[in-house]
Amino acid sequence: MKETIDFLIDTIEARQVLDSRGNPTVEAEVFLECGAIGRAIVPSGASTGAHEAHELRDGGTKYMGKGVLNAVNKIHETISPALCGLSALDQTSIDNLMIEIDGTPNKSSLGANSILAVSLANARAASNALDLPLYRYLGDPLSNLLPVPLMNVINGGAHAPNGLDCQEFMLVPHGVKTFSEALRIGTEIFHSLKSLLEKKGLSTAVGDEGGFAPELSSSEAAGDLLLEAIQKAGFIPGEQVSLALDVASTEFYKDGFYKYEGKSLTSSQMISYLSNLVSNYPIVSIEDGLAEDDWEGWSALNKEIGNKVQLVGDDLFVTNTERLRKGILEKSANSILIKVNQIGTLTETLEAMDLAKSAGFTSVISHRSGETEDTTIADLSVATRAGQIKTGSLSRSERIAKYNRLLRIEEELGDQARFAGDLGLGPKNI
């Protein structure tokens, strides 16, 4: 075993790099006394919840105001001096110290992007110092469960400039025995879908998350396309592969109504609409079916269809334990989307997942629409045995990087590797 001093933080560096949308983001590097290095890059969302932790942006004219040099300076001038000399193995203390220094409810002083970059880079440095893969360092010897991928193959809403209000239409290959087999099935359907779109004269241009962004008139039209693509690829909808939606309802919720597909719907009407979709399509998961502060509506939605499908709170919970506790108390959902940059530290992310599990909720580890080559969430999904991961479509290398990392983990685990499959989905299979 190395001496304790070997795990002490020596220096922390940071820089401004670009994400998959060409927008600036923060990269941090944590250097330990033993020579180990950890590097992490934070992602950024397009449809962001009002209650998310605060991203620090520069404003001004450079990069259309989206620069992050101020966040980089916060790391160099404030975070690094405070953390140098501390043990990288004490992740909780490091994260809590950054939260304390920030001193705001939403991390608006130091910025969640600067805090998270250091938090994740520190975990990487510690795992490298111990010569452990990140999933093993963050997890335990039983961390061998590969997640079911929720693959966003048709993009709409804030992720694509087409006529679809629903933001994501996803494939969920669950009825197989291995992650690699699930990935193969999803990939084959993705290419089947592309051929279908070409034959119908529809665009095969892709959106932010690598899914296609055709001009379609309704969610039903997208659902029908996916069913046809699944069957043409030789699979059975609802058996090997099901569907999932991210409605991102907050994006079109105005003045108490859901402005959806040319209609103005009440909360009750939106619930009826979603219930009909579940009856007509093999949907196993719906994310953000209602707006982030429509708490009464969420409880009604959960009562209506929560025993049939997974109801995932993204903007509703923003990976925040306070909002999650309220959701548990009010029975507002049965699942939480986990985005590390919504809350801003690894420790708080893990706390949210623990709370969700204690309440019988599922957790879905998720990317953001503005992603990078960083693969931390792949390791996190295995470390926590989450059972599900959202990391985009089967194109764009920032999405594929996570899938490839999971393939390597599966190979590394060998005979010990398990695939979540049907048991990874909620609520009826929890």
Curated annotation (Swiss-Prot):
Main location: cytoplasm
Catalytic residues (UniProt): E209 (proton donor), K339 (proton acceptor)
An MF annotation (GO) of this entry: phosphopyruvate hydratase activity
Keywords carried by this UniProt record: Cytoplasm, Glycolysis, Lyase, Magnesium, Metal-binding, Secreted
GO CC terms of this entry: cell surface; extracellular region; phosphopyruvate hydratase complex
Pathway it works in: Carbohydrate degradation; glycolysis; pyruvate from D-glyceraldehyde 3-phosphate: step 4/5
Cofactor(s) essential for the protein: Mg(2+)
Pfam families, per database record: Enolase_C, Enolase_N
UniProt-annotated binding residues for (2R)-2-phosphoglycerate: Q167, K339, R368, S369, K390
Catalytic activity as recorded in UniProt: (2R)-2-phosphoglycerate = phosphoenolpyruvate + H2O
Keyword S-adenosyl-L-methionine: no
Location of the protein in the cell: Cytoplasm; Secreted; Cell surface
Enzyme nomenclature, EC number: 4.2.1.11
Cofactor binding comment, as recorded: Binds a second Mg(2+) ion via substrate during catalysis.
Role, per record: Catalyzes the reversible conversion of 2-phosphoglycerate (2-PG) into phosphoenolpyruvate (PEP). It is essential for the degradation of carbohydrates via glycolysis.
Family: Belongs to the enolase family.
Protein name: Enolase
Source organism of the structure: Prochlorococcus marinus subsp. pastoris (strain CCMP1986 / NIES-2087 / MED4)
